[in-house]
UniProtKB/Swiss-Prot annotation:
Highest taxon of the lineage: Viruses
Any matching Pfam family: PRANC
Sequence ranges of the ANK repeats: 38-67, 103-132, 136-165, 169-198, 202-231, 234-263, 294-323, 328-357, 361-393, 397-426, 430-460, 464-493, 495-524, 529-559
SUPFAM superfamilies: Ankyrin repeat
Organism annotation: Fowlpox virus (strain NVSL) (FPV)
UniProtKB keywords: ANK repeat, Repeat
PROSITE patterns: ANK_REP_REGION, ANK_REPEAT
Xref: PANTHER family: ANKYRIN REPEAT AND PROTEIN KINASE DOMAIN-CONTAINING PROTEIN, ANKYRIN REPEAT-CONTAINING PROTEIN-RELATED
Transmembrane intervals: none
Name the UniProt record assigns to this protein: Putative ankyrin repeat protein FPV222
InterPro entries attached to this UniProt entry: Ankyrin_rpt, Ankyrin_rpt-contain_sf, PRANC_domain
Length: 747
């Protein structure tokens, strides 16, 4: 049934505060309880506008103050809101950005309060029920309790308002007064019987809200009245989503009514207690404040916020310091460390908080202490240790605080943890030790501290793939590799995990070359898990020096790797476009080998299928024959020097210096470079030894009880060969003769 024109006109007159016209229509017999298209009664509309004369007129004509209007609201609900959204809308529309919510409240609160009290009294006198609830079961007392109007609350209580009435969200009026940080109203409600320990649907009590807004006075009041210090609330995710949608609705409403110029004031209103009448919870407004931090456990929030006074109050009233937040299992002890609240940590320990509590990730406070800045972490670790903390407890990933300290390069924490007896060899779920983390994240200072401590086993790892030496190689960190080698790390993982193959495949020639020259035990004849030999990867690098190093370290090109397959044939089959210099080098090596092995036969058969290879082979073989013809003595030839070049000693060759100096290496150009590396130092060594012998003849004589000059020349050389060339040169130099004491050699 539609609304009559007369009723519509009457509503228009009410909105315009036209008392004369309203009286005229009412006297014509129009029902004062009629509703408009928005489902609002005339009385509710008049109350919303705060038109006292029209309200009185409607009541005098029989308007019922208990009829529900839009959102199940009664006029008494409306008048309990000291500053309604309609008023705010008008202000914004009229003044735009010139008006602020705080300014308006400060200026007009008392005026609004007095006017609203007058209206409320009129409604109650005309039968308004004070315990009526709206669609969210919010009563006028709930609204008044968050409005800041002590007098309005007092009026409602005087007429029997229920202090323990619950909203649909399970909240009493105390939740509303506390969330508005109103000490006086909260105290009044408690005096009138409000239960201080009622928890809403998210298990949030008034005390939790008081801690949330950091109100020391409210916390004291509630604790004095028996509030449960150990209540645990829940996160309010669903509530936040719901209220965000509600915010969008109010913004749409304002936009529809062209109230969209003062965004700041709108947001302030949405986050204020003035809008509580349309919220699901008293705590909703708090969520939209920039400084908001949700509280589920009073003691943890007090610690998070760094409120020493609040924390001590809670603990004094018997709060358990070891209650954790349900969603994160985080304790106050964790927050004291994470937020760098040293005094808070001290307070918690003083009240016997457990130092080794674990959160959801099984981290202890010590795990977080090592993540603090280097300048601060040890201070927290020392306090924790003094209180009995263990530094060997592991988290969900099997890591101790030392693992974490190494990961974050907290060198001071690493030193302190080691000094405190922390186990340096615990392996986590990734098979990482603390050393692994230091190497993995390239924390060179930390690696040095760990290795120099003498407590670390550099070879400890469950899988060779995660060996520190392999990690260092993967990260191309030569400094860490040096430290590990100096600490005696086992180099087997390099061979077993194909570390050299990996470097060659990645074209990391610098580190590959350095490792080959530095570590003598490296395997150069192995194949990786793809059955590719190291030499094949090196051949693709086109770096002849690295290939030479492989050969010097024992690359066996005749090694049989399969049916009719050798290391040499694999290099050619796996590598395309080999450089001429590398081909010549490989052929020269084969040509110098004995001709009776199975591998040699396979290689020779392959060489004979290629004209270029065969030509190079014949050239090399010709030069090998020449070297075999150059005899140095006792059946020893130049080819013997070449074949034994990796093991032959310079002192041995020095004895053949006279013969070596007469050899023209230009006759063997392919092998010349490798022979010169041996022959030139041998000739130089011989000269130094000979000069040292003569010097010794001059400075040592019989009357000084030395019998040097009586020794055969061969014995003299044998003795001098024990000295390195540097010391021999010092002996020869006239300025240092008197500084050298050789008596320990001869006596």
């Amino acid at each position: 049934m539609g609304i009559s024109d007369k009723v519509n006109k009457l509503f228009n007159f009410i909105c315009k505060n036209d008392v004369v016209s309203v009286r005229k229509y009412l006297e014509k017999g129009i029902n004062p309880n009629e509703k408009n298209k928005d489902n609002c009664t005339m009385l509710y509309t008049a109350v919303e506008h705060r038109y006292i004369d029209i309200i009185k007129l409607l009541l005098d004509h029989g308007a019922d103050p208990n009829i529900y209007s839009s959102d199940h609201m009664t006029p008494l609900h409306s008048v309990s809101v000291i500053i309604p959204i309609r008023k705010i809308s008008k202000l914004i529309t009229k003044y735009g950005n010139l008006v602020t919510l705080a300014n308006y409240r400060n200026t007009f609160f008392v005026y609004n309060e007095n006017r609203n009290l007058e209206i409320a009294k009129m409604l109650i006198q005309n039968g308004a029920l004070v315990n009526m609830n709206n669609m969210k079961n919010i009563t006028p007392l709930h609204i008044a309790s968050s409005s800041g109007s002590y007098k309005m609350v007092e009026l409602l209580l005087l007429h029997g308002a229920n202090t323990n009435a619950l909203t649909s969200y399970g909240e009493t009026s105390l939740h509303y007064s506390v969330s508005s940080n109103d000490l006086n109203i909260s105290e009044l409600l408690i005096e009138n019987g409000t239960n201080v320990n009622v928890a809403n649907k998210d298990s949030i009590t008034a005390l939790i809200i008081a801690v949330e807004i950091m109100s020391i006075d409210l916390v004291r009041l509630l604790l004095d009245k028996g509030a449960d210090t150990n209540a645990i609330g829940l996160e309010r995710f669903k509530l936040y989503v719901t209220e965000t949608k509600q915010n969008n609705n109010i913004l749409k409403y304002l936009n529809t009514n062209n109230v969209n110029t003062n965004v700041t004031m709108i947001n302030e209103y949405i986050a204020s207690e003035l809008y509580d009448w349309n919220r699901n919870s008293a705590t909703s407004k708090l969520m939209f404040r920039s400084c908001f931090e949700p509280c589920t456990v009073p003691v943890t929030l007090a610690t998070r916020k760094g409120s020493k006074e609040l924390l001590e109050i809670l603990l004094e009233y018997g709060c358990n310091p070891d209650i954790c937040e349900k969603t994160t299992s985080t304790y106050a002890m964790h927050y004291a460390v994470i937020r760098k609240h040293y005094e808070m940590l001290n307070i918690l320990i003083r009240y016997d908080a457990y130092t080794d509590v674990k959160d959801r990730q099984q981290n202890t406070p010590a795990h977080y202490a090592v993540k603090l800045p280097i300048s601060e972490s040890c201070k927290y670790l020392k306090l924790l240790k003094l209180a009995g903390a263990s530094f060997n407890l592991t988290n969900r990933k099997g890591r101790t605080p030392l693992h974490t300290a190494c990961k974050y390069n907290n060198t001071e924490a690493v030193k302190y943890l080691i000094e405190s007896g922390c186990d340096t060899n615990i392996v986590d779920v990734m098979s990482f030790t603390p050393l692994n983390y230091a190497v993995y994240y390239e924390r060179e200072d930390t690696v040095k501290i760990l290795l120099e401590s003498g407590c670390v086993d550099p070879n400890l790892c469950d899988y060779k793939e995660v060996s520190p030496i392999i990690q260092a190689i993967k990260r191309n960190n030569k400094n860490i590799i040096k430290m590990l080698l100096n600490a005696g790390i086992d180099i087997k993982p390099i061979n077993e995990c194909y570390g050299l193959h990996m470097l060659a495949a990645l074209h990391n020639k610098d580190l590959l070359k350095w490792l080959l020259c530095t570590i003598s035990e490296l395997e150069v004849n192995g194949v990786d898990d793809h059955y590719v030999p190291l030499a094949s990867y090196v051949a693709e690098l086109s770096d002849i020096r690295i290939m030479e190093i492989l050969i010097e370290k024992g690359l066996d090109l005749n090694k049989v790797t399969g049916p009719d397959e050798t290391m040499f044939t694999m290099i050619f089959s796996a590598t395309s476009d080999l450089r001429k210099s590398i081909i010549d080098l490989l052929i020269s090596q084969i040509a110098a080998d004995e001709e009776f092995s199975e591998g040699f036969k396979i290689n020779k058969n392959m060489i004979q299928t290629d004209k270029y290879l065969l030509r190079v082979y014949h050239e090399c073989k010709n030069q090998v024959s020449k070297m075999g013809e150059i005899k140095l003595g006792d059946g020893f030839t130049m080819i013997d020097i070449y074949k034994n070049r990796r093991s032959i000693h310079v002192n041995f060759l020095a004895r053949y210096a006279m013969q070596l100096s007469t050899i023209d290496l230009r006759e063997v150009p392919i092998y010349r470079k490798y022979l010169e590396i041996l022959i030139n130092p041998a000739i130089k060594r011989h000269k130094i030894l000979n000069a040292a012998k003569d010097t010794m003849n001059n400075i040592l004589h019989r009357k000084e009880k030395f019998y040097w000059n009586l020794l055969p020349v061969e014995i003299k050389f044998n003795i001098l060969e024990y000295l390195n060339s540097k010391d021999l040169i010092s002996l020869i130099h006239s300025n240092t003769v008197n500084e050298i004491d050789l008596s320990h050699i001869f006596i």
